[in-house]
Amino acid sequence: MQIILLDKVVNLGNLGEIVKVKDGYARNFLIPSGRARRATEANKAEFEAKRAELEKAAAAKLAEAQAQGEKLGGTTVKLTQKAGVDGRLFGSVTNHDIAEELNKQGYKIAKSQVRLPSGPIKTVGDSTVSVALHTDVVVEVTVSVYGETA
C-alpha cells in the first residue's frame, strides 16, 4: 500500500514522503495513530495544502524535545531496591521504574521512551540508559541503583 507520511517514522521516512508499506502495517498502526494517510490523489492534494502547517508543527515538536533534552541530559536517577549481600537485586529495575522516577523529578517521560540497552537492571550500581524524546533527540541518563537489605 502506498502512503503519505504525516510525521517522521523511524526506519521508514520523513514528513511528506510517499512510501510503500505492507497493508497491515498501514491499516493497523500508521493510519490509526495519525502518522500516515493513503496516497490517493485527494489525500495528496490535501497534504500539499497543509504541508507548511505540518512542517511547522514537526519543527515545534523537535524544538520542544531538544529543550527538554538539554535539561534532562546528564541527570542521575536514584532508585532503591531490595538486594542481597552479593549486590544482586530481588527483582529488577525496568523502564517503568525509571520513567516513574523521572516524572517525580518533573520531566514528562513515558515508559516507552526509556531504552534499556541490555534489558532490565538486575544489579546494584550505576548504569547508563537512553531516553528517546524524539526520533532525532536521544539523551543519556545515569541510573544509580542502591541496595536495601531485606
Curated annotation (Swiss-Prot):
Name of the coding gene: rplI
InterPro entries per record: Ribosomal_bL9, Ribosomal_bL9/RNase_H1_N, Ribosomal_bL9_bac/chp, Ribosomal_bL9_C, Ribosomal_bL9_C_sf, Ribosomal_bL9_N, Ribosomal_bL9_N_sf
Keyword flag 4Fe-4S: no
Domain of life: Bacteria
Source organism of the structure: Paracidovorax citrulli (strain AAC00-1)
Role played: Binds to the 23S rRNA.
GO terms classed as biological process: translation
Entry keyword annotation includes rRNA-binding: yes
Name of the protein: Large ribosomal subunit protein bL9
A Gene Ontology term for the protein's cellular component: ribosome
Keyword field: Ribonucleoprotein, Ribosomal protein, RNA-binding, rRNA-binding
GO MF term list: rRNA binding; structural constituent of ribosome
